[in-house]
Each structure stands twice: as C-alpha cells, then as structure tokens.
C-alpha cells in the first residue's frame, strides 16, 4: 500500500538516499513523497483503494480529475476518531442563515484541519499536464536507470495513470481535460512502450494510440519539444529539429534576445535543450528504439524527410503558429550556421558555449537542491549531467529529487507541475480561515500553518554575482512550494506576507511567535524591487525584454512564454500585501509604497478589457482575473462609486452568473480568451468562490445581495458528508493553453467566500 510521508520523515525511508545525496536548508520542510510498503494496509484498506481506482476508471471520460482519495484515506485513518458536525442543506426558497453558514464553515475547517501535514502545509495533487511523465521515463530509460529508480509499483501506477487519461479516440491531450494532440499522444505512447507495454496491453489501448498517431500524420508532426525528446531517445533525427544554438549564451546581455532576458521558466528549459542539441546527443539504440522507429511513422524511418519535418506540426497541436520571420531565422541557422559550428575551427566556440551552458545548469541544480525550477528542466538537467559524465555526483544528486515531483491518487501516479504548491496553498488557507472570524477555534491549525510559512521564507540571495547568473534578489521572498526549491515569486511573496501579517494580529499563545520584523522588511524589499516601469508586476523577475520577442516563441503549444509579462494577479497581490504592511508599519518606506501602489492600481485599470473583465493567466480565468483585479483596486482605495473600472467589473461578473446561481467557467475561457461556461451550465465551487469574494469586496451586498445569497446556497449545498467539498473541473492554467490542478482550491475558496459572506454580508450592520 502507498503511504505519503512529509518533511523529515521522507528521508530515512527513501532508499535512493543511501549515499546521503539529499540536502536541505530546513530539514526538508514541505517535502512530500509517496512510498510503497507491501505489508502496509488491512484487507479493508486495500479494498477501499481498489474501489476508488475502479470508480475513477469506470467514469474517466465523464470526470477526468481525480479527487485525491488515497491521501484523504490515509489522513482519515490517522484521524479515525474525527466526527464532524451534522450536515446542513438550504432549500431553494429558504433564506441562507448565519447558523447555516457558520455550521458549514466549522464543518469545512474541521475537515480541512484533518488533512494538514505535520509540518503545517496541506499536501495535494498539482498534476494536470500530460507531457511531464514522458520526459522522466525517457530520461531514465536513456540513462539505464529506469528499473533502479522506479520500482515495479511506481511503473504500474504510471501506466495506470496513462491509461486512465487516454482519450476515447486513443490519443492523449496536452492536459487531462484536453482533446488529443500529437505531442501528448506520441510521448505517452512512447512512455508506455518504454515501460514494457505491448500492442495488446491496456485492452488494446496501446494499439489504439498508435492508430491515432498514424491517422494524424505520424510522429514527424509532433511539436518542437516532442521532436527534442524523440531525438535524444533515438527515434527522431536531430536534422528534423530547428536549431537551438548554445552560442546564444555567449552573446552580450545588451542584446534583447539574450537568454538571460527571457522568462526564467523559458530560459531554464531551453538551457539544457540547447546543450543536448549542441552535442547532438542520442541515447543507446536498443531493440525497443528500433521498434519505435518502425511504429511511429507513415514511411520507413530512413525515408522520412527530416528537413521538411522541422516545421511540421499537427493541426491539433498548433496553438501558436510560427510567424514567417521565425521560419526564415530557423532555416538560416539550420542550413548555414549549424554546418559551420559542427566543424573546426568554429567547433571550438561550440565547445566553449557548451561549457558555459553546463555551468548554468549546475548553478540551477545546486541552488535548488537538485529540485530545479520545474519538472521539465529537472529531467533535462539530469540528462545533461549524465551526458557530461554518466558517473558524476551531479547525476546521483538528481535521483532522489525525482520523487519530490511524483504524486499518486486513485487515477495513478503523475508527475506534478512543480514540486508542489505548498506555500501558495498554505498562505491562501490562512487567509481563508482568518476571513471567517473563527480563527481562535482553530489555533492548532493556524499555528502549524504559521510555522510552515515562517520556515519557507527564503533567507539568502543566491550565491555569487547575481547579474552573471541572471538572477533577481531572493532574500525575504517566498517561493511557490518549499524553501529548498527557493525560486522567489512576486505573488507568492505577497501572499506569504499577507498571511504572516494577518497572523501577527492574533495572540502568540494561539498562533505562535510572529516572524521577525527584519524578515518582513526583506519581503517588502523584494516586492518593491519587482515593480516594472508600466506599474505592473511579473512573476519571478522584472520584465527584461520586449513583447515583440514573442515572435521567436518556438513552442507551438504554448503562448506568452518568452519574456516575463506583467499580470493582474501578481500586481494585485503586491498591492494588497503592501497596503496591509503599511497599516501595521506606517513609517517604513512609506513614500515608495504609496507610489508603488498608485502605479500598480493604474496598471490594473489600464489592462482591463472593455467589457469589464481581466484575463486570468494562472487560474480559470475571467472569474480568477476579476477577483484579483477587483481586490487590488479596492485595496488601493478605489470604491464602486468613484471607480468606473470596479463598476464595469461587477457588471461583467453579474452578467456571467448562472440562472441556477453561482458561476462555472470552463478552461476553454483561458485557451480561447472568451468567457465560456462549463458544459451544461453547471456552477463550479471555485469559480463561485472567486466571484463571491470579488463582489463582496466591491460592495455588492449594499446594492443587491441576492446574487451572493444564491452563490452561498450553492456552496453550502455542495459540501459533502464529511465536510470536504467535491473535486470538480480543473482550475489552474499557464501559458494560455495548458491546465494544471490546484487540489486545495476546492476547500480553500468555499471557506474563504463563505467566511467573507458571513462577516461582511450577514453580519453587516
């Protein structure tokens, strides 16, 4: 049976750490790892798990998102004495009473407290993308470490996950709810084959997948990221790739297209890619590789036109078509530049560039304790370390950190989009519980969460000359996940700061000692340092180049990846944090904070669409963007009666309320940039929570509280017997076109919305 271990408990039981390869800044606070124990679990436990797996499989085409049941079952067993308050429902014609809301809130927080980790964070599923596991399987296969690193049970659960998320037509999407793409289909088909699955396995699912691939043009039509993965594996030729010259890293930084000016996720993915391309690395050609060469193409492998394949992309994948200028650049590099740099004397410069690239790879690895910024560059960096030296310490240091990314639920084992969302979820959870004015009843929960947030702050900048490594300051920031990950993010810093400021208002006997004042000042310094000239805030760093650079975005599947753009979410979070800080510390950098908030609020108004909406880039979508837009403007001092932006925003949200009450927004809103309801106009508890919070902040209860009453009824009636809330459609998004799971949102936002509703609507004078 699988068991989730958290924090320091992950280390002694980790067989991959036999040589002491794991390091940590804070004794692994926030680390979450699943271990398999063959002797663990009663027959009843195993039957319950099997039932959950079967139920998911039976309904996988209607309900594509797991409910994180394995984790919940484990916590339920650990809290077997837990008995919640009786459930309550509100009938259609019945008024929503304070008693009904209060009981729903207590039931919700009671339950949510039972699934909190011992270190204070809330573990959960951060999966969703379908192109992550293949990179891991391919890397481990090439390095010969597949069976040594992934046990039979790991491999079985990965196969379960891939089969469960295969679409009816035989293909796989970019993410769990998406239609089939060549990128998803080829990589997941290859993964199953590398894991030992044959054509007849999965009740014919493997053969069905191959048919989808061939019916849609074969693997030559895979996207550029897919071409790269297939090339290193040996089932696609490097001649069929557009160039990724490592010499870009040797160019002067003043050039607007220098990699150091790119969004950090973009540059950290293309950094190892250009190393592998520059070396034209190909893994061992084994019998399975020879077989895949025959299985994936419409013509014999030696007859594929690789030059033509460079720019081929299946129509199902084409979200961002290459502009003509890009095709001209790639053709010039491919036909003129690359032949020169593969020969002496220019090859000497190539070797120098490759050395430079590896220095940056090692810097990233060492400063994230080999977690890396995300799962794509994690496995690519690991592969590069092996290519550089198969016996290197760097490669061995990578191995135990693989498990930081693996998560298991009733749908199988997935690779998460980060090493978790620990800090982000915990900061939101604190604010949600505090909004209820019931905080003193949940002192233990808040104390643990407070400790997690304090333990997760980044206490030092990265070593060395930050400018040389293209890094922003980190000291005082909060990361998205753990301190060991360590990459600083503007909105995570803001939400972390908001949470500790709220908790500082409660007695230390209840929630523990407040964070040191200097650490709060450091967080404020990070936030102020991240404001761009347009007044907005980007994610990890300042915006370092120009939007026209997006013309060179080579990833056909994703939008807005080349530079770190400014976002309503990051800007709003910064405003809220600085305003909250100023109330408690009015004398610290007051003028700077006032100027920053004023510019940021103007930015939020300037990017509002004419219909009153804000596009949410990190959540689905206009309800999410609207929540941040409204909340930021209100924090900055705007009011409904003196701000047309707020009036338009409220009108927009109210126009999207469903006839049944509540809001339900499909992921298609983000992809197509047009507000789209969930199928059958069903409400979603998370969208409903965001819309409620927005309208309450904008004073809707003073004008007409009816939509809020309807929404509250939806949330109350959605609560389950045990106090949990149901997992509904996927609610996270990145790069316009890919969705990601935020499993904690189903608990956080009903609590937060009903908390604000109870205190600011029902208890309003």
Swiss-Prot record:
InterPro entries: SQ_cyclase_C, SQ_cyclase_N, Squalene_cyclase, Terpene_synthase_CS, Terpenoid_cyclase/PrenylTrfase. Keywords: Isomerase, Repeat. GO terms for biological process: triterpenoid biosynthetic process. NCBIfam families: squalene_cyclas. One of its GO terms (cellular component) is lipid droplet. One of its GO terms (molecular function) is cycloartenol synthase activity. PFTB repeats lie at residues 155-196, 520-565, 597-637, 646-687. The keyword ATP-binding does not apply. This is Cycloartenol synthase. It comes from the Eukaryota. It catalyses: (S)-2,3-epoxysqualene = cycloartenol. Oxidosqualene cyclase involved in the biosynthesis of cycloartenol. Belongs to the terpene cyclase/mutase family. The active site is at residue 491. The lineage of its organism: Eukaryota, Viridiplantae, Streptophyta, Embryophyta, Tracheophyta. In cultured cells, CAS1 mRNA expression is high between days 4 and 8 and decreases at later growth stages. It comes from Luffa aegyptiaca. Its EC number is 5.4.99.8.
């Amino acid at each position: 049976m699988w068991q989730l271990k958290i924090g320091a408990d992950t280390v002694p039981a980790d067989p991959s750490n036999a040589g002491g390869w794991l390091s940590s800044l804070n004794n692994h606070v926030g680390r979450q790892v699943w271990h398999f124990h063959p002797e663990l679990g009663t027959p009843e436990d195993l039957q319950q798990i099997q039932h959950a797996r079967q139920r998911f499989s039976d309904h996988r085409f209607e309900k594509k998102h797991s409910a994180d049941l394995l984790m919940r079952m484990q916590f339920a067993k650990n809290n077997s004495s837990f008995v919640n308050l009786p459930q309550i429902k509100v009938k259609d014609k019945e008024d929503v009473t304070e008693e009904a809301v209060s009981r729903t809130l207590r039931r919700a927080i009671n339950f949510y407290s039972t699934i909190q980790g011992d270190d204070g964070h809330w573990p959960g599923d951060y999966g969703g993308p379908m192109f992550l596991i293949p990179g891991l399987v391919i890397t481990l296969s090439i390095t010969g470490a597949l069976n040594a690193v992934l046990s039979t049970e790991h491999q079985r659960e990965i196969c379960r996950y891939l089969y469960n998320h295969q679409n009816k037509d035989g293909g796989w999407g970019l993410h769990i709810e998406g239609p089939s793409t060549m990128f998803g289909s080829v990589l997941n088909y290859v993964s199953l084959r590398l894991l030992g699955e044959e054509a007849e396995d999965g009740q014919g699912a493997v053969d069905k997948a191959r048919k989808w691939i061939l019916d849609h043009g074969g693997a030559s039509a895979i996207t550029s990221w897919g071409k790269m993965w297939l090339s290193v594996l040996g089932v696609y030729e490097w001649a069929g790739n557009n160039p990724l010259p490592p010499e870009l890293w040797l160019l002067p930084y003043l050039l607007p297209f220098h990699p150091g000016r790119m969004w950090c996720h973009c540059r950290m993915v293309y950094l190892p890619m250009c190393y592998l391309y520059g070396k034209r690395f190909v893994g061992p050609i084994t019998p399975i590789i020879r077989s895949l060469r025959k299985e994936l193409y419409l013509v014999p492998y030696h007859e594929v036109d690789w030059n033509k394949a460079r720019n081929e992309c299946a129509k199902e994948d084409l979200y961002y078509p290459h502009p003509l200028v890009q095709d001209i650049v790639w053709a010039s590099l491919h036909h003129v530049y690359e032949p020169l740099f593969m020969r002496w004397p220019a090859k000497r410069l190539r070797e120098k560039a490759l050395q430079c690239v590896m220095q940056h790879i090692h810097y990233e690895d060492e400063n994230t304790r080999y977690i890396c910024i995300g799962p794509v560059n994690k496995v690519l960096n690991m592969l590069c370390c092996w290519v550089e030296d198969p016996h290197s310490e760097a490669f061995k240091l990578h191995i135990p950190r693989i498990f930081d990314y693996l998560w298991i639920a009733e749908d199988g084992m997935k690779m998460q989009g980060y090493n978790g969302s620990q800090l982000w979820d915990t900061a939101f959870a604190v604010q949600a519980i505090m909004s209820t004015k019931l905080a003193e009843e949940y002192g233990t929960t808040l104390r643990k969460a407070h400790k997690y947030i304090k333990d997760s702050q980044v206490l030092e900048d990265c070593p060395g000359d930050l400018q040389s490594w293209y890094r922003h300051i980190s000291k005082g920031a909060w990361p998205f996940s753990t301190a060991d990950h360590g990459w600083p993010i503007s909105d995570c810093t803001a939400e972390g700061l908001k949470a500790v400021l709220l908790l500082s208002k409660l007695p230390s006997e209840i929630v523990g000692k407040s964070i040191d004042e200097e650490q709060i000042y450091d967080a404020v310094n990070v936030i102020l340092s991240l404001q761009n000239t347009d007044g907005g805030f980007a994610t990890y760093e300042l915006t370092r180049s120009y939007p026209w650079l997006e013309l060179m975005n080579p990833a056909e599947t994703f939008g807005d990846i080349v530079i770190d753009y400014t976002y309503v979410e990051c800007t709003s979070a910064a405003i809220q944090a600085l305003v909250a800080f100023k109330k408690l510390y009015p004398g610290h950098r007051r003028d700077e904070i006032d100027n920053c908030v004023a510019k940021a609020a103007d930015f939020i108004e300037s990017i509002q669409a004419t219909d009153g909406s804000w596009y949410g880039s990190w959540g689905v979508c206009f309800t999410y963007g609207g929540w941040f837009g409204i909340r930021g403007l209100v924090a900055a001092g705007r009011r409904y009666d003196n701000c047309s932006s707020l009036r338009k925003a409220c009108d927009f949200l109210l126009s999207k309320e469903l006839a049944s009450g509540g809001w339900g927004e499909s992921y298609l809103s983000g992809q197509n940039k047009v507000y789209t309801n969930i199928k059958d106009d069903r409400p979603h508890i998370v969208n409903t929570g965001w819309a409620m919070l927005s309208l309450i902040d904008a004073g809707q209860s003073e004008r007409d509280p009816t939509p809020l009453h309807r929404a509250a009824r939806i949330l109350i009636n959605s609560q389950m017997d045990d106090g949990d809330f149901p997992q509904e459609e996927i609610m996270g998004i990145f790069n316009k076109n890919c969705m990601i799971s935020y499993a904690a949102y189903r608990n956080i936002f009903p609590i937060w919305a009903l908390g604000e509703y109870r205190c600011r609507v029902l208890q309003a004078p």
